[in-house]
Each structure stands twice: as structure tokens, then as C-alpha cells.
């Protein structure tokens, strides 16, 4: 509670699926592990699926969502807000305090943080980098303030980028992932990584298996566990979690599909 958690990883690993599952969970009563509240789902990629939300709810808690009325009541507790520009998103974040109070929001999701930033600040020009840094810093400050003020969780998703060599890592340079050298890591650089309390990295082990890593956390050890995406959401495999040697979360390497030249 009261923290900002980032879920980062390559396309297709289940970041939005994770967010949809958490949305359902937050609407559940507290005795069922929920927050018994409403969810604000800020969608910047038009990735939210109402059909998937209903499927997860029915599969996860069929006793609570067995009728059309029960499903409708649950769906109405997930408030979806679409934003296509950085300025629009920032204006939304600046009014979050009022919305949390008015709509009894108990979970805020931003899916995704990176998409608008990378679209509007794609150039490496110095002025662009300054504007990007200022926008990300302002965005992070607003989200952290809301999380702490109301003691509610804030979830943000992030994408991946490719870094080339030691100099690129030191300077936080981001280059397109289709290049054939370098390594894949979380987008938006080290400055942004310092603004999140917890970082979960989703990655591919192979074409079929996926893994989530706790890359940064104030309370949890560096752990990783395999998972699959099923009708009721993200499901941990039976073998359980494994401890791994942690590294700087800002340069944690990420495994993508084996068809890509990274491993």
C-alpha cells in the first residue's frame, strides 16, 4: 500500500493481463483478498479489454460473478480512462486527488507509462531529453504523492529498450530494439527507475514459458518464478519461486523471444 509498482517487459509477456487481473482482485471484498473498492485504469495504448476483464472475473471467482448483474456491478467498478498525449495524461494525474475521493478509488493503474513518452520524445536532441526528464519526474511525483496520501497501490507498466555498450548504459541512451547488438533492459532509463518503489520484470524463458522477476523491492528479496497466462489471469507454476543474485534494476537484462537476437 502507498507505493508505486512498475511492471516491465517485452510485448506479449502479459503486462496488461497482469493489470486486468489486479483490477478484478481490487474489486473483491477484503475477506477474499481484495480492496473492496473501485479501480482507475488509465489506458494509453488502447489495450484494455472489457471482455477479458469479465472472463478473468468469472474464472477467478465464479461464486461472486455468476450472474449478469454481478458481472455488470464488478465492471462498473473499473473506471477506464484513455489518454493519447503526454499533456492529456499529465492533466489527468493533476486531478487524481479529487477523483480518488469522489469515486472511492483503491487502485490506480497506468498502462503504459512508456508509450506516450517514447512517441512524443523520440528524438535524442538535448531539449527533447530535458522535456522528457521533466515530464517523467512530474508524473512520478504526482503518482507517488497520491499513493502515499491515500495509502493505495499505484501500478504502472513500462516497455523495453536496447542498450549498446558501456557508454550507452552510463548515459541512459535508448536505441531501437531491432539492432543486432547490445542488450535488452527496461525503458526510460535510470532516473525513472529510481522513482518506482518496486519493479517487476516479465520476460520470456523460451517461446512457451514466461518468468516474473522481483528486480527491486523495499521488502522482498530478489526472486523469480515462472508463470502462465490462463483464463483466470497470471498463474504461478507449481515449482515455486527461486532466489537469484540481484543487480542494478536500471540495467537488469531481459530475455525476449528466442526468435529475436537477444538471450
Question: What is the meaning of each model-derived region?
Answer:
Residues 1, 16, 50, 68, ...:
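Amphipathic alpha-helical transducer elements in NTP-driven molecular machines
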Residues 1-66, 70, 258, 262:
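The Walker A/P-loop phosphate-binding site
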Residues 5-7, 40-42, 79-81, 155, ...:
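Hydrophobic/aromatic beta-strand patches that form the interior of the parallel beta-sheet core
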Residues 7, 53, 78, 111, ...:
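Conserved RecA-like P-loop NTPase ATPase core
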Residues 10, 25-33, 56-63, 96-103, ...:
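Conserved, well-folded catalytic cores of nucleic-acid-processing
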Residues 12, 46, 85-86, 114-115, ...:
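Conserved beta-strand elements of beta-rich interaction domains across eukaryotes
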Residues 34-129:
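Conserved inter-motif catalytic segment of the P-loop NTP-binding fold
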Residues 131-137, 141, 145-253:
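Phosphate-binding/switch region of NTP-binding enzymes
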